[in-house]
């Protein structure tokens, strides 16, 4: 029984894998330069199928450690025999066109006549034929099918040889340049031999019995022993963070306790956050713990819980304690040395006698701390006024400064409720202003405010629809 008869018998029993078997069992002969590389990866013989060549190339790259340890889809082959064969120093598995060009030059398609005369092929054919004869000798129907298929196979081989041996009749077989189309791609653009779709390791002692799986379910890529074939897939993928957020305030929860029995249970909103998603770049750049510009030396340590906080934060992120030596902890402004103290004699003299214009330059005057006298006054000494006028002007300026500081301090004290923790999470600072129309409410942190807007919730205070969320920086 010939090999073509055995193949046709398999076609009759299982029509589905016919196309796969025919395409994958087309043999190619490897040139000596590429054959040396394949044999170093464990290949035996000089005729292989296309998938076997691809498999041993992947094994060679893995065993030699030619792939980049950080970006494992990149192969560095500059100082290796593979690089000399390719003519390049590096290539990417995601774009293996240089590798395919090299295969087209170093693989020759083998005709049916040449494949039938291969020694290793004859051994596998003999063993396969013996097994098939033992299995199906008792079935007359199968015998008829074998005869018919044998005739068809011999006709196909004869027509194949006649069509390709017209140009060179003296040669026993024709070596054709490999002109195949690589369609072994998955949706990600990676070749199948790097995805590890081969279920078993190859044993080329019997090429005919090599079990080459189909590549129909390429999306699932279910394999049994592909640890070595998937060396480049160890790259870190985009991390996904699943969290459940229930945007309900404490007051609304108490009101809805009695209604939970009659209504359906509260819906939990599941959020999936992608770290590399472009839509969340602005949110993550404004988060509290991802300030990349602040170094560890600039952070301040809380005196209560010893947590390091950002220098722009006035409260501890963990225990909400006010930062030590913050400007509110400084003592109130006292009378400085620049504030003049008017002696009683001068004031009484001013009341009784009015302005005293001396007839000579005074040698001793009232305190003039912080008041600069113009130099032009020395040019007209006889018109110099009493120092009391300058002192009264400085006193009025210092009084205005004190009043301004007290007003600012009062405004800070009145805005202290705004510095309380977030109304929803009770943990972060209130820095997310919820804007609706021409008004806004500052009762939540920026993260909770963004979650409210994404889930189309209303304002926690007035239940108005949220138009935008603005982050507030309190300095």
Curated annotation (Swiss-Prot):
Any one GO biological process: negative regulation of apoptotic process
Gene Ontology annotations for the cellular component aspect, listed alphabetically: nucleus
TM annotation in the entry: none
SWIB/MDM2 domain mapped to chain residues: 26-109
InterPro entries associated with the record: MDM4, p53_neg-reg_MDM_2/4, SWIB_MDM2_dom_sf, SWIB_MDM2_domain, Znf_RanBP2, Znf_RanBP2_sf, Znf_RING/FYVE/PHD
Subcellular location: Nucleus
Motif Nuclear localization signal boundaries: 427-430
Keyword presence, Nucleus: yes
Disulfide bridge positions per record: none
Keyword list, A-Z: Metal-binding, Nucleus, Zinc, Zinc-finger
Family per similarity comment: Belongs to the MDM2/MDM4 family.
Subunit field text: Binds to p53 and p73.
Name the UniProt record assigns to this protein: Protein Mdm4
Organism of this sequence: Xenopus laevis (African clawed frog)
Underlying gene: mdm4
